[in-house]
From Swiss-Prot:
Part of the 50S ribosomal subunit. Forms a cluster with proteins L14 and L19. The keyword RNA-binding applies. Residues 135-155 are annotated as: Disordered. GO terms for cellular component: cytosolic large ribosomal subunit. Belongs to the universal ribosomal protein uL3 family. Methylated by PrmB. This is Large ribosomal subunit protein uL3.
Amino acid sequence: MALGLVGRKVGMTRIFTEDGVSIPVTVIEATPNRIAQIKSEATDGYNALQVTAGTKKASRVNKASAGHFAKAGVEAGRGLWEFRLNGGEGDFEVGAELTVELFNEINKVDVTGTSKGKGFQGGVKRWNFSMQDATHGNSLSHRAPGSIGQNQSPGKVFKGKKMAGHMGAERVTTQNLELVRVDAERNLLLVKGAVPGAIGGDVIVKPAVKA
């Protein structure tokens, strides 16, 4: 996993090129990520940077977290995230900050977030199943899934069968999004297109693995 940044989805807007072409962009506010811990192969079994972002009221931070942040000498953030290190990322110190300038030379990014929760949904919405006949004698099974198995053999429903159930509210990554602009002054990343999650949700931005 490449080094990245934790940010917050602000919303969508559009920007214009010099030719007047409109580009739809998602605005991600990535305030400086503070390094809370540096994990190493010797002590933790793997190399990684643990970072925090944002702020949290002191009264809302439990003792374990407060001690962890105090040891690192960083202000308590709204959470902790890790980025695995491969060895070629350079030297880092606890308490240092990672900013949007990490992406100055990057053109494509992968954005990970938690998708919007949709609650309990049927097969048509959740899995794009085809609907059955609206008329011609069908009076009860318009959005029903149909058969879910075979016969006496195998005599069971296989695990993973697509059915109605809870939809959304899961970790989703959108790959190869174009990074249109880096605004270091306001700690903003402008990414072309949509990214997973609701406005205000935490997102992780990393250089694209397939770029």
